[in-house]
Amino acid sequence: CIEPLRSPAFTAADIVRGIREGGGQSFTICVEMHGRFNVATAIRVADAMRPYDPLFIEEPVPATDVGAMREVQLATTLAVATGERLRSTAEYGPYLEQRACRILQPDVGHMGGITGLKRLAHMADSHYVTVAPHCCWGPVQAMATAHVSSTIPNLLIQEDNHWRTGVFEETVVGGYTFDPQYIDVPEV
């Protein structure tokens, strides 16, 4: 018996549907696509997921292809997010100028630190684009990102990986409060 090949759009939508039905509307879903699709498939996947209300789809096509990202963003009502691997405001410029996404995900470690991330956030704000900083490398990066996030008007969310172990508590003076709803920004 040969079974029909399932479309990636339906497989992805089934996963997101299961998450939404299992948890209801009490939390936000962000879908990481990691540049796995071509434009046509990315649009089909976005359309199939739309009923389950994800906050955004992240890098539905390879992040290095601004034109492809723009095509997807223009074809869907879902917000497209990108940028965690970009390393300068110059690299982000085409995404903003071509309106290729609605959300930027800069990484403070790639952007030249706090000043670079803050500069990019202001640049994005001038294009009506929100920022959801990427943050996955450890306690120093988490605190630097939290400090920038607390000062930018176009912050959407801040990524945070709470997989950490005691290293966070040992590194951050005064501890580190993690709650899915907020981050305490310590004074140093």
Q: What do these predicted regions represent?
A:
Residues 1-76:
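Metal-dependent enolase-superfamily TIM-barrel catalytic cores that perform enediolate-based chemistry
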Residues 47, 53-56, 64-182:
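Shared catalytic-loop signature of beta/alpha-barrel
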Residues 183-188:
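Short, intrinsically disordered, charge-balanced linker/junction segments flanking boundaries
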